[in-house]
């Protein structure tokens, strides 16, 4: 397995043959199933130096051969010793119980693993591990551990992991114009998007092909790119849409609004824009005209008629917005100041009287408390926090977001530390409390049927190491993690009952040793051994008969009895 190669990498680089010779001798002398993988690696890598006479004289070496079932290893061993096949056979006959004792250990340990729900869960994830490097825990380097024990206090965790982002102040009007233009172009595609949509506009426009831009899109294109005759679609696709020198100032962003605008600009540069950006601007901007315009963009309804909707009745709001979109988005209604009141009368006339209440006020939907905004100005935040605001929720709520400041512990630098922390708890505790999106959550409260949630919680590298170590405890080597690992464990138990694998492989590769093998099996004259090799002897009955005919050391009854055992009709 790969983790064994990395374990011995420093000695491999130094070509430390003495180390590997001693390492193999130690692992053979103190053999256990957990040594199978390491022994196999050392033999494959340094067989010319490490396969000494002492190794071939040790019973445990042949127990290893019985468990490994690896053709490449068999070839190496067979080339290293001309009589290893007979040595294996003799060791099996003399120390049969030693072989069976380790088989019993395999069965016990495999049954324990198959009863372990945690192990079964990780094996289901194994297809995701194929190209992953497995690593062990390094809790001494993880800030979420103290004296190799996980810290459980979230405030302490926050203090250790939080890193404030340095936002650069941007030119407010330039960013707002760019935001409106990009959002309007996105709406021109005619597609529907979630308020927190994170798809980049480049990909969307590549799929749609050229789109016809609305008047608003082209108007704001003129604001952002004066004297540029290219249509918004081709301008966005082919030209650079941002200019850091004009947008960024030399000052740090101080207020929450300045920080959010800086983040929005960085996202627009990556072609990402959504409705939540408009909502946040509406909440934080103090200009009434900008707030009004953002509201129109959010709902896609002229501002003059928005005042009839009130946030206190979600059913009404939903009814009216759908009603207006279905009946009056026709390029005729509310397009002329002279006809405005006539159009408004027609709209009102079609509204269900039970739904109508002129006192309704949509602006209070996103109205924010100045005190709350000031608290945000004073709060240290990072890009993770603003990202949560823009992408992790359908409805932007500053009060709710204030309580989610702990989510800021997530960033590229802390992601692995959190995953290592969660993985450690999962592998060592039942239903632990883990860190999920900046909050402490009971593991049982999360949907672990979702791979995206599982791998946002846990480290693939650590889970793979856990799986590798459990399989190594059985002496199992997995080359393809997409295979059915549970099936391999179960079939491994039955395969170990077949003691002829190495003998069959050796005789297939070298027919000249067949006579010697047959002779050795018969001469031991042990019923149990003859039964173990019954199929092998049946397949090579010619050599059996030849030997029995020529030997003078067996009586007529001995020969008859041996043939009866081979043919399965003895009493």
Swiss-Prot record:
Its main location: virion. Induction: Expressed in the late phase of the viral replicative cycle. It is found in: Virion. Late protein which may play a role in the virion morphogenesis and have therefore an indirect role on viral transcription ability. The keyword Calcium does not apply. This is Protein E6 homolog. Belongs to the chordopoxvirinae E6 family. It holds the Pfam family Pox_E6. It comes from Fowlpox virus (strain NVSL) (FPV). It comes from the Viruses. GO terms for cellular component: virion component. Keywords: Late protein, Virion. InterPro entries: Pox_E6 (IPR006749). Transmembrane segments: none annotated. The keyword Repressor does not apply.
